């Protein structure tokens, strides 16, 4: 009885391992919002305070007319009004992030109010999490509109990262269409964070701009390309010197060249590479998992259920026409069998075995009474014969050997 209670007791901490990104992303967005606030205030302070001092000195010394002083003050007032508008927008964004965080904390806190896995509240909570995982997978796969509709229908818009993934997919799509403007604007907004990134997204984007200039084979564009390289590629000389030398070599090779690496640099597949690189960089900066959460959850669940029998040489009972048994193993199902093929096996420290096991000549083990009862129900089977429920093979009862478990 105690063992049964232990097995059904809900461990909230283990469940929350999968849901860390649920709180990590709002925290990261709040941090970036604060950084933007500090940066805007610092920039305006560096302009307004010196300008105010200069205007005061000029007014007191008589070097400026009252009209000039008023014009200077009008400029400063205009900038401060602009600062106020920006700060109000950032404040609204902060309120939205805090509201989202509060909803997510409330959702996760519900787990601590559920004592058992058999509680109906746990089933309801799990359904909400499943909806979140499905929406996350849809957003990462580019089905943004469908994901938004599902989130609205389930009333869980605060629990999923719709805006973040929609923006990510929009920029990734623009790169696949051969445009770098949106991606470079995103890099400019996240310049400080990109310095710590393991990826060189901005360099690759600037390199692609250079390649497109060279592709035209126009002499005027060649000059523009060299100016572009000195301005945007040269600063990366210490870390990307090999790539910069290859870029210089493009001047001597036309777009239809077969010589590597120039052929690959001209290839249209580079746009796909840039799109994927942007997604990896975007997820790294926002502390998002590189894989969909559904894949992670499925991998853990499939591995926990997988046994060597699931991928044995014999076909599973769910797909075997000779089988007299119906498999309830999810791994043996046609939908999940291939997905689980490369996952590790479950670590079973205890086994549940029939109390009268026998082994058939083909090496498969069954309970004797269950095997005999099943064989008697088959009218086509001769007396003294037994049939393997999984493979359909027929053997003599005398060929059965008792199994002893030490």
From Swiss-Prot:
Pfam families cross-referenced by the UniProt entry: CTLH
Zinc finger (RING-Gid-type): 329-391
InterPro entries recorded: CRA_dom (IPR013144), CTLH/CRA (IPR024964), CTLH_C (IPR006595), Fyv10_fam (IPR045098), LisH (IPR006594), ZF_RING_GID (IPR044063)
Domain named LisH: residues: 126-158
Domain CTLH residues, every copy: 164-221
One Gene Ontology CC term in the entry: nucleus
Gene Ontology MF annotations: ubiquitin protein ligase activity; zinc ion binding
GO aspect biological process, one term: proteasome-mediated ubiquitin-dependent protein catabolic process
Subcellular location: Cytoplasm; Nucleus
PROSITE patterns: CTLH (PS50897), LISH (PS50896), ZF_RING_GID (PS51867)
Keywords assigned by UniProt, alphabetized: Cytoplasm, Metal-binding, Nucleus, Zinc, Zinc-finger
Family statement drawn from the similarity comment of this UniProt entry: Belongs to the FYV10 family.
Function: Involved in the proteasome-dependent degradation of fructose-1,6-bisphosphatase.
Protein name according to UniProt: Protein fyv10
Taxonomic lineage of the native organism: Eukaryota, Fungi, Dikarya, Ascomycota, Pezizomycotina
Name of the coding gene: fyv10
